[in-house]
Amino acid sequence: QDWKEALKSAASNVVDKATGGKATETLMIGDWQYEAPGVKLESDNALADVGASAVTGKMEEQLEKLYALAGIRAGACKFSFAADKRFTATFGSRTFTGTYEFTGESHDIALHFEMSSKYDLGTLNGKTYLSGTDLQILFPATRLLKMVDVLGQKLASFSTTAATVSTLVGKFDDLYLGFEFTKQ
């Protein structure tokens, strides 16, 4: 991350805090293209944060492999949020629609997926953060892995990669995994 990106990120955080999260709610409306896995540890324990940062790179690498097997990769995954609280999510060749609720100060988001004939994603509760021009949508690690499993192909390589990620995830409480997007 260069200094310009760091400055944008800091500025967006200041504006978001000053507006009680309303800036994120307003600025998240639009089309977002998937870029990379998102990983965040919510903890007040500095030692745990250091431990988490040590495995974040490996976790992101394994998530990227797992996501690719489920059709989630750059250029093939996007989210669109509308002002009327509806969203469209595309994972590879699969498109899902639904509604969302966003709570500004806590950054909580609830994605209510409409029922599909093949997939039942239900409601996903997570967190949404804007950092400069990037959007992060994160979910409790175990819930995200269940969603990816629903989308994933039943291949041996999927199961092996999922097991590796699950092992890494099991080492941390309050771990959020998800997606990083850039605005289209």
Predicted regions mapped to residue ranges:
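Lipid interaction determinants
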Residues: 1-83, 88-90, 94-97, 104-184
